[in-house]
UniProtKB/Swiss-Prot annotation:
Protein name per its UniProtKB record: Stomatin-like protein 1
UniProt similarity note: Belongs to the band 7/mec-2 family.
InterPro entries: Band-7_stomatin-like (IPR043202), Band_7 (IPR001107), Band_7/SPFH_dom_sf (IPR036013), SCP2_sterol-bd_dom (IPR003033), SCP2_sterol-bd_dom_sf (IPR036527), Stomatin_HflK_fam (IPR001972)
Record domain SCP2: where: 287-398
């Protein structure tokens, strides 16, 4: 791992000498009667004077003698098995010894204490936090970090709580990096930012005996758009057609079905998407809610594969700008799935309550279900894991 990532162990005083400083059950200490060459590093084991070295050897001998006398019984407590993916850090009379393992390790009673160190790759997440970008946008950003310990001695001697220290380091590095960038750069260059965070975090954690293998930046939601950005959202081509289809249909309905004097290309876009459903009730209602148009336009994207993947029935209680609440359903339990106005025929698996603007942001991929739930913009009644499967529905819109 160290050779692949380009990191190497740095000389850190007595820490490097710990690897060769213990032999036999007495654990001979280099520098017992004279100081080590090169001085003593910060936090390292200081050289022993000859009285201290003599007492250390005598007590260790008595501990080993006690182990031999009571071996049939003490063997159950003194022998420890260390698996391949672990190392055991042993402290004898408070002084650190060579990392032990894998295999069977013998500990002396009363004078040895130990701590196991897991060398396998582990992961943690940086909880989503609100950050302000360079252009004034407010966004909720988190990160997933994978790391492993390459020096068990350093991981025990330098930091008390390694997980918390690494998480705080990753969060601070992420905050500093995102404050210097505008929102568009954060969204378009997440991989580049993640690689930069990887290097910055490793610059700090490699002195702790820890190496970060991967950092994945996750933008949960954009809570506030940039101050100097245009009002219109950036949509992909499919969602632009979906929005133009509904908005164009609403304008024609308000005009009583008469041709709109607007641009011809907008009229053509509406006519291309809308022919399969000329009898939709939206034409008879001059003030059709935006949520109804967006939800019913999901029907062409539903499929049997999506039904088998999700397999749930959702009820959406959408709060309209007027303050009233309207109910819609998305049934992905049978056939190709259904979507429409009103409550479902059976009992829904999940009831989702949100504002109409948040629903629009959700369908336009400006807001993710998890980010909306954590920020309080989406309220869920029922199985939360089932509600998070709405992400599969949003992916079907691509």
């Amino acid at each position: 791992m160290l050779g692949r990532s380009g990191y190497r162990a740095l000389p850190l005083g007595d820490f490097d000498r710990f690897q060769q400083s213990s032999f036999g059950f007495l654990g001979s200490q280099k520098g017992c009667l004279s100081p080590e060459r090169g001085g003593v590093g910060t936090g390292a084991d200081v050289p022993q004077s000859w009285p201290s070295c003599l007492c250390h050897g005598l007590i260790s001998f008595l501990g080993f003698l006690l182990l031999l006398v009571t071996f049939p019984i003490s063997g159950w407590f003194a022998l420890k098995i260390v698996p391949t993916y672990e190392r055991m850090i042993v402290f004898r009379l408070g002084r650190i010894r060579t990392p032990q393992g894998p295999g069977m390790v013998l500990l002396l009673p009363f004078i040895d204490s130990f701590q196991r160190v897991d060398l396998r790759t582990r992961a943690f997440n940086v909880p989503p936090c609100k950050l302000a970008s360079k252009d004034g946008a407010v966004l909720s950003v988190g990160a997933d970090v994978q790391f492993r310990i390459w020096d068990p001695v350093l991981s025990v001697m330098t930091v008390k709580d390694l997980n918390t220290a690494t998480r705080m380091t990753a969060q601070n590095a992420m905050t500093k990096a995102l404050l210097k960038r505008p929102l568009r750069e954060i969204q378009m260059e997440k991989l580049k930012i993640s690689d930069q965070l990887l290097l910055e975090i490793n610059d700090v954690t490699r002195a702790w005996g820890l190496e970060v293998d991967r950092v994945e930046l996750a933008v949960e939601a954009v809570l506030q758009p940039p101050q100097d950005s245009p009002a219109g959202p950036n949509l992909d081509s499919t969602l632009q057609q979906l929005a133009l289809h509904f908005l164009g249909g609403s304008m024609n309905s308000m005009a009583g079905g008469a041709p709109s004097p607007g641009p011809a290309d907008t009229v053509e876009m509406v006519s291309e998407v809308e022919p399969p459903a000329p009898q939709v009730g939206a034409r008879s209602s001059p003030k059709q809610p935006l949520a109804e148009g967006l939800l019913t336009a999901l029907q062409p994207f539903l499929s049997e594969a999506l039904v088998s993947q999700v397999g749930a029935c959702y009820q959406f209680n959408v709060v309209l700008p007027s303050g009233t609440q309207s109910a819609y359903f998305l049934d992905l339990t049978t056939g190709r799935g259904r979507v429409g106005h009103g409550v479902p025929d059976g009992i829904p698996d999940v009831v989702v309550e949100m504002a109409e603007a948040d629903l629009r942001a959700l369908l336009c991929r400006e807001l993710r279900p998890l980010g909306a739930y954590m920020s309080g913009r989406l309220k869920v009644k029922g199985d939360l894991a089932m509600a998070m499967k709405l992400e599969a529905v949003l992916r079907a819109l691509k």
